[in-house]
Amino acid sequence: MFSLGFVSAILGDHTLEEVFVFASTHGFSCVEIMCWPASNKDARRYAGVCHIDVDQLDMHTIEHIIQLQLKYKVGISALGYYPNPLDDDAEQSKYYIDHIKKVIKACKSLNIPVMNTFVGRDPARDVDFNISRFKEVWPSIIALAEELHIKIGIENCPMLFTRDEWPGGKNLATTPAIWDRLFDILPSKYFGLNYDPSHLIWQRMDEVAPIYHYADRLHHIHLK
């Protein structure tokens, strides 16, 4: 049976404990906690929310987070961080990749099984170019996830809503045809989907078939 939760980004002005209070009060059993860098400069909607600062995750903080879950009887389904690791700016790309790896390590420290993110994309380049970038960037990320036994859930949102995201969007992993190519490159069981059927619906695709076809890759679910 699924546990019902929400993404903590919607409560960006709340403290971590206030997020747990809200979840408990409203009958949720889990929360996906946002872990953007505390010094984050990303300005898009829901970006930049930092409810757990993974750069400051010492033993005292880890114990505090564990106790919050016990106190409010609300678990953490995943840690989330959704940048563009395939950014065409090499320095920015490295910054995103490095922080993704920090969040994966935080999952291990907190005994959280899933880290959710985007594959990323250079919106000005075609799919084949971005596939080649994926081959360069993602093997080391998945190698770390495998080593620490943390599942990576890739959300399938195209991210093409603002001028800077056009024409291709800032997330490559948007359709089953592309998922197949990515899974062929990285067949690891730790590399899967944070599946949101709504993104297939508005792209006029079958949102039900992937639930069956990619059942072993559905590491986390978003619903709208």
Each predicted region: which residue ranges?
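A short, structure-level motif marking secondary-structure boundaries and short turns
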Residues: 3-6, 49-51, 87-89, 125-127
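Short polar catalytic/cofactor-binding loops
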Residues: 8-15
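Active-site acidic/histidine proton-transfer and metal-coordination neighborhood
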Residues: 63-64, 68-75, 84-195, 201-204, ...
